[in-house]
Amino acid sequence: MALSQGLLTFRDVAIEFSQEEWKCLDPAQRTLYRDVMLENYRNLVSLDISSKCMMKEFSSTAQGNTEVIHTGTLQRHERHHIGDFCFQEMEKDIHDFEFQWKEDERNSHEAPMTEIKQLTGSTNRHDQRHAGNKPIKDQLGSSFHSHLPELHMFQTEGKIGNQVEKSINSASLVSTSQRISCRPKTHISKNYGNNFLNSSLLTQKQEVHMREKSFQCNESGKAFNYSSVLRKHQIIHLGAKQYKCDVCGKVFNQKRYLACHRRCHTGKKPYKCNDCGKTFSQELTLTCHHRLHTGEKHYKCSECGKTFSRNSALVIHKAIHTGEKSYKCNECGKTFSQTSYLVYHRRLHTGEKPYKCEECDKAFSFKSNLERHRKIHTGEKPYKCNECSRTFSRKSSLTRHRRLHTGEKPYKCNDCGKTFSQMSSLVYHRRLHTGEKPYKCEECDEAFSFKSNLERHRRIHTGEKPYKCNDCGKTFSQTSSLVYHRRLHTGEKPYKCEECDEAFSFKSNLERHRIIHTGEKLYKCNECGKTFSRKSSLTRHCRLHTGEKPYQCNECGKAFRGQSALIYHQAIHGIGKLYKCNDCHQVFSNATTIANHWRIHNEERSYKCNRCGKFFRHRSYLAVHWRTHSGEKPYKCEECDEAFSFKSNLQRHRRIHTGEKPYRCNECGKTFSRKSYLTCHRRLHTGEKPYKCNECGKTFGRNSALIIHKAIHTGEKPYKCNECGKAFSQKSSLTCHLRLHTGEKPYKCEECDKVFSRKSSLEKHRRIHTGEKPYKCKVCDKAFGRDSHLAQHTRIHTGEKPYKCNECGKNFRHNSALVIHKAIHSGEKPYKCNECGKTFRHNSALEIHKAIHTGEKPYKCSECGKVFNRKANLSRHHRLHTGEKPYKCNKCGKVFNQQAHLACHHRIHTGEKPYKCNECGKTFRHNSVLVIHKTIHTGEKPYKCNECGKVFNRKAKLARHHRIHTGKKH
């Protein structure tokens, strides 16, 4: 039995939107609309694909090359040849409509319907027979015309070559009475036939009779299949938008568009999901939502294979692979991969907050934020933890909470290796390394690393305390303060010590308690070196040095260092009620605080050390203290069996074996195993020297250096060498000295195998290989490998000469120069040359002298090839090539290439003549002049002419004499 086909147009399955309604749709809804329309289109075409197919041919006309679309009828038995081709042509036809509509939209911004005239006729391709010549888009119905423009919205915008497709006069070729008649063959598959039987889209007729376009527009001449479509079309010419919204005044050209728009105001959501009961205002949104339940994901990424339920989600995902960010903010230049992201971002600049809460009138920039906020009023918490049954209002909060049970910390800091359970915690943590403080208070310009800290800080200025205790009515500026306060009423103590099982209400109390077990005092005063176990104790102590008094009386303006002192003072003015402790005389403003304070004294009397009589608040404190008497060391290292009294000491020790150095310097990248080492190291960059000597005022970067320095003033040297009797102020100095006797050199360089008796000497030596010069002069930017060299160099700029000769009162920049100078007064020359017996005051002078005998000159000038026996001589020689003169006279500004020349020059200004002749008492500025002068008394003439044997007392006279033999005048 043959199946008959009924009349079906694209209108029967189409969903229509006006341009106004179309603009209200977000990108995801538009993508879904496009997908549904295309799917309906394909379904309709597939039902009649073999009998109606559009094929394009290009033919030359009188007007030039024009694209002509021919439609015809193919026999069912030819379907396997052209099926795919036909469908591709139909899809291309869609794009023709899309581009045409785009141009019309640019030119007129009017109606979404566009007319494209098609030239229809017969073609003999594949020897097909034609039963009619109407284009398939006419066969599908005029509704299809009005929807093709919407399909264009998801095409990439670009320039269209031809603004408007030229119409072709085809009136003579097309008859309005033509019909398309298709009789399908009986060899259709059984399954396909069943689909036809079950489809509600088909009627029991054998032929499809497409309606004539009998309704024509008088203005444009355009014809339509239905009168209703004609009426909608005529609105374009009238320019009328007859349906107006009573709420916002927006007008629409069709009543159903207005009905759809009104749901924005009424909140009506007539489309309900049968699976979860969720409702939607549009059918398209419901269709998209259904895919969440079915799990349908037919959009696949060709790059990574990931699938998506929406095409819009796939488009967004593809931007990850391409890295494309085509949407740019005109305000700040930031780019985005999606236009919606740009829209959201612009609200940061405009301050727009279009989403308002009906309960409290609070406004939000994003709809998602409003939805989360609404749960505060409703109390809805749909997300439940399977472990502890705790509920949450957000799924992300539940995900973060689950990590408390699993211990998962997927976010790792690249700087120190610390891991975090939340990405936000890692972002905040990174600011500790970078020092970034992006949040600034407008009132006082104080900056903060975290936004929450800024918000809490602002309440200082506003005095706002929005968090109230339901038990006692007390208000707080922070929710955390309220949570802590409630524990006073509930007695909850969630923080427990692993060592002694003591519990605490607050984590900070537990942290302070742990210090009892470790004995650690992390907080150190930079002024006097005193250490404290609590930061608050250090803060109070520092006020002794700074003189800061932050607690001020509002009545008289008097300021105090401590809050208790202010409370006690305010009693004079009759402000508040004072509670005084009879044991320590400390005062408190309320009974609760003093009650907590009394426990300290009561507990102090509970636990006493039988050995030394010391009292402790807790038994655990006493247990830790007892180790100082018993020598007990319960914490043992598994690697080397070394034992420790405190767990923290063991943890620090383990880093020796693991090599872990979690503390990194942001300036130079150097890492350290302890935070205290990093703190000391940073002072090299900052130049900070917080430790000051009370005797001479000299400052130091480390407390240990100050202690060593103080021994200079006291003269105390308790450490004595048993070999030679030499005494030292430090034990480490004695240890290093003993290696002179034993010859031990335990520190070896891996580069050159050179060995050293001190580790510091090895570290300094390594810089020769690495070229590292970490110590930089702030005045001239010159860098040095040793801090001592920088200190010596700095004296050139400051003119400081701290080393004074007790004999003549002369000052020197370097101690070595003073030692050399003292030999002048003593006449001592302990260093003797084995070759010639000549003696020298300094070992360096002897080494230089030895080069005369060996002839060795290892230092060569790369410019001229001249060789020198001393590196210093080569450095001075280099300045002849470079012209560098780093030594400047502070009096007249004259510059010199050698420091010795500057020193000699200074004597011109000072009139100093330190070199005196012992024979006649005459004085000289330069030693060389004195040496020449002495030859007058001795008669010595050491300079002999090789030509004639004549002798001279000065080298310059010999040089002049040589010219007589050579004949040179200069």
From Swiss-Prot:
InterPro entries registered for this protein in UniProt: KRAB, KRAB_dom_sf, Znf_C2H2_sf, Znf_C2H2_type
Cellular compartment(s): Nucleus
Zinc finger (C2H2-type): 215-237, 243-265, 271-293, 299-321, 327-349, 355-377, 383-405, 411-433, 439-461, 467-489, 495-517, 523-545, 551-573, 579-601, 607-629, 635-657, 663-685, 691-713, 719-741, 747-769, 775-797, 803-825, 831-853, 859-881, 887-909, 915-937, 943-965
Top-level taxon of origin: Eukaryota
Gene designation per UniProt: ZNF845
The protein's name in its UniProt record: Zinc finger protein 845
Keyword set, alphabetical order: DNA-binding, Isopeptide bond, Metal-binding, Nucleus, Repeat, Transcription, Transcription regulation, Ubl conjugation, Zinc, Zinc-finger
Cross-link position per record: Glycyl lysine isopeptide (Lys-Gly) (interchain with G-Cter in SUMO2): K205
Any Gene Ontology biological process: regulation of transcription by RNA polymerase II
